[in-house]
Structures are given as structure tokens and as C-alpha cells.
Amino acid sequence: MNIDLNADVGEGCASDSELLTLVSSANIACGFHAGDAQTMLTCVREALKNGVAIGAHPSFPDRDNFGRTAMVLPPETVYAQTLYQIGALGAIVQAQGGVMRHVKPHGMLYNQAAKDPHLAQAIAKAVHDYDPSLILVGLAGSELIRAGERHRLVTRQEVFADRGYQADGSLVPRMQPGALIHDEEQALAQTLDMVQAGRVKSVTGVWTTVTAQTVCIHGDGEYALAFARRLRAAFNARNIHVIA
């Protein structure tokens, strides 16, 4: 059995370099919520050195709140902003002799696109128009995955090791109780349930089915490195291969 393990990087965390030795895919911030040209270049070089698949991590234009503010923007604006960010990272990747593999939206852009078909369509179209060979990463079972499929993109359904789930398969909003899982044992058990059994227990105790093709570890999390090591060990013990 194979699973992709991804992390968001280039967001100002000192652990990026070490984290990139543990994951198979990296989502690199493109400047709209965090990062800049130099951090993108540094992360690209580190990812290439470690054989990690490189992806763009576009966001709403919201550096003050780390891309976590809800915004209502015209789909055409989201299309243009997504293209802009993908293109910026793509130029750096190409200049370093690499190949960009995927796109995963960040924060509130990701969450809103999971439920808003018009926003999801704008993102999927931007990815397709830039490079139809790119993989579009989105919340498992979401509108973003469906939009990617309509554009005939390869999609990858994502689950979260350290986030609480609602009964409908969506993530618990960050400001609500149960949104973040701080207990390592609980996060590990949830991840293994999702990967091996295709199910997740919601904060209300309801089990729901989920497709896990890639697991996210938040690089800005306090215990990201320790948990990444623990998760890799758990996968190895169960003959689950971490591969992009």
C-alpha cells in the first residue's frame, strides 16, 4: 500500500529543511499568505535535494491573517491570482532544473473551494490552463476535487492528520472546539483509520467514509517534526510506503 505524505512549507517555520527529509510532497507558499521569492527558491532547492515532489500553495491575498480570512472575490479574480502564484513558483522550479508536480490551495481559499463550486471551478481552470499535467490536491470528496475531474485533471484527495472532522466530511472551522488535534496518539489513530480503513470519526462521534490519497502534516504545527517521524515509523511498521 502506498500513501503520499505532504507538508506546507515556505511559511516562515525553521523546521522546513528537516521536514523535507520526512515527507514525499511539499506545498510551497507563493507569497500571498506567506513566503517570498527567496523562500520559494530555498524550498525548491531543498525539495529537489531530497527528491520531494514540488507543488504550489496559492492563497487568497491575506498576509496579515496567514490566508485564513474568508473572502468573496469574483471567480475571474481568483483565476488570475491562482495563475499568478503558480507561475511564480513554476519559474523558480524550472530555473532550478525541476518539475512542478501539483497545486494545493491554502487556508481559506482551500476551505471555501471545498464547498463553493464557482470558486473551485476558477482554481481548477487556472491549474488546467497553466499545465494540464499538474495534479490538483483538495479535501477528500470536495467540490474542488469534482471541479478538477471536470477539467480532466489528475486529482489527489487529501486528509488531515491533525484536524477535526465534521459529520459531512468537512473540517471543523479553526475557531471552533475540536478543530485542531494536539494529542499525538489521537492524530496517529485518526490517520491510520483514514488511510487503512477509509473512515474518519467526526467530533460528534459519527463515522464517515473518506478517501485518503495524501496526508497533510502542517509544517507550522508545534509538533510537526516529531509527529512526522512518528507517522513515518507507523507507516513503515504496517508496510505502507510513503511515495508521491
Swiss-Prot record:
GO terms for molecular function: 5-oxoprolinase (ATP-hydrolyzing) activity; ATP binding. InterPro entries: Glyco_hydro/deAcase_b/a-brl, LamB/YcsF/PxpA-like. GO terms for biological process: carbohydrate metabolic process. The keyword Oxidoreductase does not apply. Keywords: ATP-binding, Hydrolase, Nucleotide-binding. Its EC number is 3.5.2.9. Pfam families: LamB_YcsF (PF03746). This is 5-oxoprolinase subunit A. Belongs to the LamB/PxpA family. NCBIfam families: PRK05406.1-1, PRK05406.1-3, PRK05406.1-4, PRK05406.1-5. Forms a complex composed of PxpA, PxpB and PxpC. Catalyzes the cleavage of 5-oxoproline to form L-glutamate coupled to the hydrolysis of ATP to ADP and inorganic phosphate. It comes from Salmonella choleraesuis (strain SC-B67). It catalyses: 5-oxo-L-proline + ATP + 2 H2O = L-glutamate + ADP + phosphate + H(+). It is an enzyme of class 3 (hydrolase). Disulfide bonds: none annotated. It comes from the Bacteria. The keyword ATP-binding applies. HAMAP family: PxpA.
